[in-house]
Amino acid sequence: MAQKRDTYKYELKQGNKVVYVGITDDPGRREQEHRNDGKQFTSMTIVGNASTRQGASAWEEQRIQTYMDNHHGQTPQYNKNETGK
């Protein structure tokens, strides 16, 4: 049986700066959770189409690693580690 493609990949940005990379099955709810947690961002951008949870998790890890490669080993401001967890 095929896996559901119900997981969205997204980035939170403050202006043009990526401050968080994540995945969710409910973008509207997740955006509100981030705001309620006090994260400062100007936009939430959905990246590509919905994916399987496994595919989205792999994208998340790779996207954070690419960010780190381009920012002297630093994760986006609100990501706690390179896996997005």
Which sequence ranges carry the predicted segments?
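Structure-specific nucleic-acid interaction/processing domains
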Residues: A2-K85
